[in-house]
């Protein structure tokens, strides 16, 4: 790969970059996963642990991934090739970039299907389909959607085509223009819904649930879940922030932008939690009802409440915007790689990759109906297998390698140039990057893959390997 394969695109302003990166981070995880895992793990105590994990694990990797992208000046694969050469590191570090590009593309192949559910629900809500609906009606609607391959494939196709259309137009004409409309719209809708939440009569209960910690309800599994979600929610390890960082001019501060990204992502998750739990509690429903919270519990609430058609439609518009803004960032690393390294123009690259992702996505769409009895990894469906490999292997591995490279392989002067900080902040950042972040990721990584009776052994072996790498690195 040539050193000359550098990013020619750039963001028009730091504000647009922050909006795009926030759009990448704010997705279904904020509106779907965060509320239900908070509900399942006791509320306030879980939120407190989650915020600590964002600070100690998420932000160091966020800074590092953006810095590697800008210092490498290219897509994740080429950026790591450039950085390995410039810093005297092994050529194998290019695998970090390849892992991110593949992870993003694979996640998008099932993300478009799940995002399609939200588009379907937005349309159904707009038509008044959830007005006065009861729990049986919602359950039947959701089951009918999942049982229909044609419906799932239609919505999957719609989301895929939209995503590729935007990305094919480029950074300024496509992603920037879409984000400039979508992110302010998302924030406005969220604030309108928050205003409504204060009138439900359950806002105080919702606030107490989210922010009053009860540590008696906090388990070790809840801590692991908080650590894992803090890592995944910021869109780390899929190459999105690395390629977005490569478009960031040197005059803009990564540290300042990174803090805004982390703050905005966390704020959206917490505000969405306040909105969702206010509506759930006001209707006497359960906060810890799993993934069905978004697609089964909330439609019941909207169906029963005054103004439910309007606020339900607004809510699902919010979900659609969050899903689409993340979808664009998941494929951008691969499109940029095709364009810069393989000489395939952006428009052609986007549609070629879109076709491949659409084909893989068919497996996910069929996993809920025709292929529900077809198993790949153990007893997992095609969708569950893809989700398991990306979420439990590829993303943690990517995050771990980003932390290791930024902490030990990147020259200190390069790190200081990209991430200028005060001495105290720099020391805290480097300590977290070298020790806290890798150890936390190793623990989460192992807990997701290994049976509990072998967990401590695997963690000990993994930490010994990491310690060996550090010792060898210091000797050189």
Model-derived segments and their meaning:
Residues 2-8, 115-147, 247-251, 256, ...:
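Helix-loop-helix connectors at the membrane interface of multi-pass transporters/channels
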Residues 2-7, 11-13, 176, 180-324, ...:
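Membrane-embedded translocation segments of transport machinery
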Residues 381-401, 426-476:
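A generic transmembrane alpha-helix motif of multi-pass inner-membrane proteins
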Residues 12, 19-29, 104-108, 112, ...:
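Hydrophobic, membrane-embedded alpha-helices of multi-pass small-molecule transporters
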Residues 1-32, 59-66, 70-98, 249-253, ...:
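Membrane-interface "cap" regions at the ends of multi-pass membrane proteins
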Residues 16-53, 239-245, 255-259, 263-264, ...:
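Transmembrane helix-boundary motif of multi-pass solute transporters/channels
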Residues 5-10, 37-41, 71-99, 112-168, ...:
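Inter-helical loop and helix-membrane interface segments of multi-pass membrane transporters/permeases
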Residues 16-18, 24, 153-154, 264-270, ...:
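Loop-to-transmembrane helix boundary motifs in multi-pass membrane proteins
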């Amino acid at each position: 790969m040539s050193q000359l394969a550098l990013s020619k695109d750039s963001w028009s302003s730091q504000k647009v970059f922050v909006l795009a990166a926030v759009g990448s981070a704010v997705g279904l995880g904020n509106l779907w996963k965060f509320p239900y895992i908070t509900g399942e793990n006791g509320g306030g105590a879980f939120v407190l642990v989650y915020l600590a994990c964002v600070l100690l694990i998420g932000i160091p990797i966020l800074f590092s991934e953006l810095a590697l992208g800008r210092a490498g000046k290219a897509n994740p694969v080429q950026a790591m090739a450039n950085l390995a050469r410039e810093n005297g590191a092994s050529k194998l570090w290019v695998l970090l970039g390849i892992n991110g590009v593949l992870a993003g593309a694979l996640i998008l192949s099932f993300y478009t299907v799940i995002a399609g559910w939200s588009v379907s629900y937005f349309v159904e809500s707009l038509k008044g389909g959830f007005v006065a609906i009861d729990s049986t009606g919602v359950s039947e609607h959701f089951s009918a959607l999942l049982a229909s391959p044609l419906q799932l494939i239609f919505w999957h196709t719609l989301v895929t085509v939209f995503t590729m259309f935007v990305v094919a137009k480029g950074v300024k004409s496509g992603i920037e223009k879409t984000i400039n409309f979508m992110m302010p719209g998302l924030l406005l809708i969220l604030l309108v819904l928050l205003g409504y939440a204060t009138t439900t009569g359950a806002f105080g209960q919702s606030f107490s649930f989210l922010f009053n910690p009860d540590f008696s309800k906090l388990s070790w599994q809840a801590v692991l879940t908080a650590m894992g979600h803090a890592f995944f929610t910021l869109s780390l390890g899929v190459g999105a922030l690395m390629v977005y960082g490569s478009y960031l001019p040197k005059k803009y501060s990564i540290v300042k932008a990174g803090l805004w990204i982390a703050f905005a992502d966390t704020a959206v998750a917490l505000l969405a939690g306040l909105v969702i739990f206010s509506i759930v509690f006001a209707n006497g429903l359960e906060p810890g009802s799993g993934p069905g919270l978004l697609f089964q519990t909330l439609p019941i609430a909207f169906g029963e409440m005054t103004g439910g058609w309007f606020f339900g439609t607004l809510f699902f518009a919010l979900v659609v915007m969050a899903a689409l803004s993340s979808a664009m960032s998941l494929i951008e690393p691969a499109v940029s790689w095709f364009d810069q390294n393989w000489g395939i123009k952006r428009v052609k690259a986007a549609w070629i990759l879109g076709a491949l992702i659409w084909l893989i996505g068919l497996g996910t769409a069929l996993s809920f109906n025709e292929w529900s009895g077809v198993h790949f990894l153990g007893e997992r469906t095609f969708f569950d297998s893809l989700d398991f490999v990306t979420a439990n292997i590829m993303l943690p591995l990517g995050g771990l390698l980003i932390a290791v490279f930024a902490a030990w392989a990147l020259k200190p002067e390069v790190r200081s140039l990209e991430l200028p900080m005060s001495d105290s902040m720099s020391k805290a950042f480097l300590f977290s990057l070298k020790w806290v972040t890798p150890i936390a990721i190793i623990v989460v990584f192992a807990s997701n893959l290994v049976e509990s009776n072998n967990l401590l052994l695997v963690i000990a072996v993994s930490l010994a390997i990491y310690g060996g790498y550090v010792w060898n690195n210091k000797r050189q």
